[in-house]
Amino acid sequence: MIIPWQDLDSDTLNNLLEHFVLREGTEYGEHDVSLADKVDEVRQQLKQGLAVIVYSELHESINIVSKATFSSAPVDDIPE
């Protein structure tokens, strides 16, 4: 199930974004990128509709995935 990011309290959304960024450990190359910049990048992807927040009832978990990943996979097959 998609959770609209606009429906989340701003603190809740920020905590979710920080948790996601820290969990993902995305590599940004030679240059260090601050946590705030990484969070802002994911926030922009949500605002632009490139990413969605997905809740899995089966796994009782929440994740952020690309819109393309969500559109092409059953919700229970989306990587956590």
Swiss-Prot record:
Belongs to the UPF0270 family. This is UPF0270 protein ASA_3305. It comes from Aeromonas salmonicida (strain A449).
